[in-house]
């Protein structure tokens, strides 16, 4: 916890003041901290738009490393808690395994990108002029595979392959509720609610809505829960989470779209959703990436997979 005694002669917004004190904090991290009651102004939770002035006391309940206060010998990414786990690597790309609970990038010290850079640095393979670049994203609470490009050519190839749906993405998840039918392909439309930070699923198209397609099949059931294999055909924000919730089967542990009573009962901190498999097309015309043709990469099965299979989690 850090306690700040404001000495500003002119009133300034709380969020601007905190970002001036801790440059590594961005708007997203501040909003999350406020939602989690980790920011107090004069002992009370206040909106980030509140103006602070001389004499005010601000307390922020974040770790020193989250505030960028730990001394570093070397690049800032060494503050990441651990080096990344690589599922696969060649001269063009890295397939990294992201744990649930860390963002892929952003202002925090412990991100997937920083873990990747830390691993390369510790193995004396880090090139500051040509660092690897993220080609897609996962939500903070989602675990699983993320592609990073080592070259600009690989970045273009991977981003375009994802955009054109040439790389098949398969997820594993546990839902609260058994979907009926046990296997289906869902077609809907999605709009963003930027004010509340969520998306909404619609049955019919409307202005600004984007088509979403999600396929699923049931691997196993345990009590009120179902273990699903999900194919992400389109890749929109929160698509799997919102789409499954729209049919009455929210993902276990999901605080935005899920059953919070069940989440509390089972003491789940993050959504039970894993980006489990990335499958490249059987034919790749570009000779620079032909070695990837037909390759399938898989993350280790998440902890909840076996617990649903054997009935421990139900």
Predicted regions mapped to residue ranges:
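Short histidine-centered loop motifs in beta-beta connectors
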Residues: 43, 223, 228-231
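Long C-terminal interaction/binding lobes of large macromolecular proteins
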Residues: 216
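RNA pseudouridine synthases
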Residues: 1-194, 221, 298-308
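Pseudouridine synthases involved in rRNA/tRNA modification
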Residues: 1-32, 79-84, 206-210, 223, ...
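Short, surface-exposed secondary-structure edge patches
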Residues: 47-51, 229, 270
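Short Pro/Gly-enriched beta-strand edge/turn motifs at strand-loop
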Residues: 67-69, 196-199, 211, 257-262
């Amino acid at each position: 916890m850090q306690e700040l005694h404001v000495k500003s002669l002119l009133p300034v917004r709380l969020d601007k003041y905190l970002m001036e004190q801790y440059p590594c904090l961005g708007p997203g991290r501040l909003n999350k901290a406020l939602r989690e009651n980790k920011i107090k102004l004069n002992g009370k939770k206040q909106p980030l738009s509140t103006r602070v002035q001389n004499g005010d006391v601000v307390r922020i309940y974040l770790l020193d490393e989250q505030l960028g206060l730990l001394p570093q010998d070397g690049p800032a990414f060494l503050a990441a808690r651990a080096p990344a786990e690589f599922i696969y690597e060649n001269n063009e790309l890295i397939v990294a395994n992201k744990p649930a609970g860390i963002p892929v990038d952003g202002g925090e010290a412990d991100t997937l990108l920083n873990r990747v850079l830390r691993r390369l640095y510790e193995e004396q393979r880090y090139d500051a002029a040509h660092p690897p670049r993220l080609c897609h994203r996962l939500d903070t609470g989602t675990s699983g595979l993320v592609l990073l490009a080592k070259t600009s050519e690989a970045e273009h190839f991977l981003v375009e392959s994802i955009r054109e749906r040439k790389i098949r993405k398969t997820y594993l998840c546990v839902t609260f509720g058994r979907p009926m039918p046990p296997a289906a392909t869902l077609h809907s439309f999605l709009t963003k609610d930027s004010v509340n930070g969520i998306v909404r699923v619609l049955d019919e198209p409307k202005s600004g809505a984007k088509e979403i397609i999600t396929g699923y099949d049931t691997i196993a059931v345990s009590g009120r829960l179902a273990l699903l294999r999900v194919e992400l055909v389109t890749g929109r924000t929160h698509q799997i989470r919102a789409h499954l919730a729209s049919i009455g089967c929210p993902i276990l542990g999901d605080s935005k779209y899920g059953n919070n009573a069940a989440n509390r009962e089972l003491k789940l901190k993050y959504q039970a959703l894993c980006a489990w498999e990335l499958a490249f097309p059987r034919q790749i015309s570009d000779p620079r990436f032909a070695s990837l043709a037909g390759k399938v990469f898989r993350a280790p099965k998440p902890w909840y997979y076996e617990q649903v299979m054997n009935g421990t989690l139900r």
